[in-house]
A protein has these predicted regions:
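Short Ser/Thr-interspersed hydrophobic loop/turn segments at strand-loop and sheet-helix junctions
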Residues: 51, 75-79, 175-179, 203-204
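N-terminal glycine-rich flavin-associated loop
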Residues: 83-104
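Flexible, small-/acidic-enriched active-site or ligand-binding loops
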Residues: 146-147, 176-213
Length: 365
């Protein structure tokens, strides 16, 4: 395994950082946080024009045909800049589910729109979503909590369980987010992150909306979730790297007791420990991305990366607030932007404890 970046990946990382430093300072992040949509359409369109929304999609679906590692490089910079919007939800998770499905009609209908930013697709995977059959196709009913960006989504992919007496496993269906009998209620969240309760009231769906076949959606869902976890870990890594840079800069500038606080051993240890944590997390994240790119089993590697990213989130939050001290707990300071998003990422797709349990189970086998 060679985790050094290719020349193209280095260019992608550098140009992404330059673009985001100019187009997405923390003032833009704060503006998006206060908005109803949770993202800024102008910035979204600019990222689409750069090809970022279709990095890992094939060219025949409007993407640029990059690898998961390419996407990981990009999202490390996206996380570093706290870029708001449904990139992970639509451009990674939903796009991958569609790409893995055997439904060519839905691929052609949705993937080009995801890549050019005109469509936003989200995922609902609550335990209370059920599908059953009727004379014309299937019926979707139930509700799902924590559906990200449902308020601005054009389509919702629903991961459903079978109703009593129906098929034996998960069925994936795609529905128009503005269809009748779909009700969306915004939920309270950290950093005003746009999550919704989505309710589906016995919606009739044709078989053309089924992704991957009746009761055959679990493999596509699991594969997409693995890739999404790697990308989310890359975002966490980028945020932690930026926090490290912030605290090192501040420690060198802040003078107390007649000298910079960077000369105090306790502060040095905080910064050094965070540097080690960032580097070790980066190795695990890129290892998981590499294995998935090689079509190798990566369940354990993804769980290790996710667990380490969760621990890194806490390390970065603790180091940042400890070095910046009291001012970092105010909403005016940028540190709270990083710590609030760290908590969201740690809880998403299974928290640190869950993934440590997954690793333990694998070791015991």
């Amino acid at each position: 395994m060679d985790f050094s970046l290719t020349e193209e990946q280095q260019i992608l990382s550098r140009t992404a950082r330059e673009f985001l430093e100019a187009e997405c300072p923390t003032t833009v992040v704060r503006e998006a946080e206060k908005s109803e949509k949770g993202y800024l359409p102008d910035l979204w369109k600019k990222m689409a024009n750069l090809g970022w929304l279709g990095v890992s999609l094939p060219e025949n679906y409007g993407g640029i045909g990059g690898s998961l590692t390419d996407q990981t490089v990009l999202f490390e910079e996206i996380g570093r800049a706290l870029v708001p919007g449904p990139l992970l939800t639509s451009s990674v998770l939903a796009a991958q589910i569609l790409l893995d499905s055997r439904n060519e009609t839905q691929k052609q209908n949705l993937l080009p729109g995801i890549a050019n930013g005109e469509l936003i697709v989200t995922l609902a995977r609550g335990e209370r979503l059920e599908t059953s059959s009727d004379d014309t196709g299937i019926v979707l009913s139930g509700e799902s909590l924590f559906v990200p960006f449902a308020g601005v989504a054009s389509h919702i992919i629903c991961a459903t369980r079978p109703a009593v007496g129906a098929w034996p496993d998960t069925t994936l269906v795609v529905v128009d987010a503005d269809a009748d009998k779909i009700f969306k209620t915004r939920m309270g969240s950290i950093a005003n992150y746009p999550q919704y309760l989505a309710e589906f009231d016995d919606i009739s769906i044709s078989l053309e909306a089924v992704l991957g076949g009746i009761a055959e959606g679990r493999p596509s869902l699991d594969a997409a979730l693995q890739r999404a976890m790697v990308i989310q870990c890359a975002e966490t890594l980028g945020r932690a790297q930026k926090v490290l840079e912030m605290v090192v800069q501040y420690a060198g500038d802040r003078v107390q007791f007649g000298r910079p606080i960077a000369t105090f051993q306790a502060v040095q240890h905080r910064c050094a420990d965070l540097k080690v944590a960032v580097d070790s997390c980066r190795m695990l994240v890129y290892q998981a991305a590499w294995r998935l790119d090689q079509d190798m089993p990566a369940h354990n590697e993804v769980s290790m990366a996710k667990a380490k990213a969760g621990i890194l989130s806490r390390n970065a939050t603790e180091a940042g607030h400890s070095v910046f001290a009291g001012i970092s707990f105010t909403v005016e300071h940028d540190m709270q932007l990083y710590s609030s998003r760290a908590k969201i990422s740690e809880a998403n797709f299974g928290d640190t404890g869950y993934h440590l349990d997954q690793i333990s189970i694998a070791v015991e086998r």
